[in-house]
Amino acid sequence: MSQLGSAVPSSNLPEGLPVSSLALLILVLIPCVLLLLLLNCLFVGYKLFRMTRRKRDRYGSEMSLMHSSYSTRQRITRFSDEPPVAPNRKTNYVSVSEPMLAPPITSSLTSSAERRATGQRAMFLRPDGATYAGSESLRVPHWRTSAPVLVQSSDSDMERVNTVPPNSPVLRVTPNGFSVPMTSLRRSSTMELESTSLDKIHVECESASIIPQENSCYVVSSSSSARGSGLDSDFGASAGVSLRILSMDSDGFPGSAWASALEWDYYDPSYVTQNHVPKHRPQAPPITTKQYWV
C-alpha cells in the first residue's frame, strides 16, 4: 500500500508541467495582442489626422480662390450715390489699374484715424478722368478726359481714318463696288503697261503712298527669288500639281503696246517624261590636274 501511495503523486507530477507551460504561453501572448491593438489604434488615428488636415488645406485653398474672385468682382463693381429710381443718377467707377486689397486686420493699435487715412488713399476714378473724392489738384489732363469716340463716316477720303489692322492686305475698290486684295508685286522696267482699261486680262497692280500709282504686271518665274503664291514650279513638278503660269502665246492684245499678250496656261509636270523630251544639262567643266611643290 505504501508503494501504491507513493506511485500516485509521481503520476500527478508530469501532468502539472504542461499546465504551467500553457499558462506561460498565454501570459506572453496577451501583451503582444494588446500591443498590436495599440499600434492599430495609433495608425487609424494618424490616418484620420491626415484626412482632416488635407480637408482643411483644400477648404483654405477654396476660400482663398473665392476671396480672390470676390475681390476681382468687387473691383469692377459700380458704386452709385443715388438710388436707381432717381432720374439723374450719378455713377462712379472703380479704377481697375491696381487691385483693391482690404486693410490688414490688426489689434487695437490701429486707430480710427489710421483707418480713415487708409480709406482716403484708395482713389476711385470715373471714365471721364475726374476723381471720386473731388480733389482738384489730382485731376487728369484735358486730353485724357474725353472717352474714345468712334470715327464718323465723311465724304472725303483724307478725313477718314483707316480702321484696318496694320498687317492686313490693302483692299483695292473696283468700279463695280467689289474690294480686291492687293499684293506687293515685283516691278521691272521692261514690264510696264499703259494705263488703259483692260478687257480680257486681270492685271494686279500695286500702289504706294509715297510714289505715284503705277501699273505693273506680275509674271511667275521658276526662280526661287520671285515672290509668288507660295508654290514654286519645282515643288509643283515634284508633287504632281498642275501650276497656272503666265505665257506669251496668243496674238492680238487690244489696248496694249505689247505685240503678244499674256494668257493663263496650265503646266503639266508629266509632259517631259511622257514625250521623252531631253533635258538641257550644262557640260561639266574639264578636270585638270595640277602639281604643287611643297
Curated annotation (Swiss-Prot):
Its main location: membrane. Residues 1-23 are extracellular. Keywords: Cell membrane, Developmental protein, Membrane, Transmembrane, Transmembrane helix. It is found in: Cell membrane. Residues 154-175 are annotated as: Disordered. Residues 45-294 are cytoplasmic. Belongs to the huluwa family. GO terms for biological process: dorsal/ventral pattern formation; embryonic axis specification; positive regulation of canonical Wnt signaling pathway; regulation of canonical Wnt signaling pathway. A motif (VPPNSP motif) lies at residues 164-169. The chain crosses the membrane at residues 24-44. Key maternal determinant of the dorsal organizer and body axis formation in vertebrates that acts by promoting stabilization of beta-catenin (ctnnb1). Localizes on the plasma membrane of the future dorsal blastomeres in early blastulas and binds to and promotes the tankyrase-mediated degradation of axin (axin1 and axin2). Axin degradation results in stabilization and nuclear translocation of beta-catenin (ctnnb1) for activating organizer-specific target gene expression. Disruption phenotype: Maternal mutant embryos lack the body axis: embryos develop normally during cleavage and blastula stages but lack the embryonic shield at the shield stage. The dorsal organizer is absent and embryos fail to form the head and other dorsoanterior tissues. A motif (SLRRSST motif) lies at residues 184-190. The keyword Membrane applies. It is a single-pass membrane protein. The keyword Glycosyltransferase does not apply. Was named huluwa after the Chinese animation TV series huluwa, known as Calabash Brothers in western countries. GO terms for cellular component: plasma membrane. This is Protein huluwa. Interacts with axin1; leading to promote the tankyrase-mediated degradation of axin. Interacts with axin2; leading to promote the tankyrase-mediated degradation of axin.
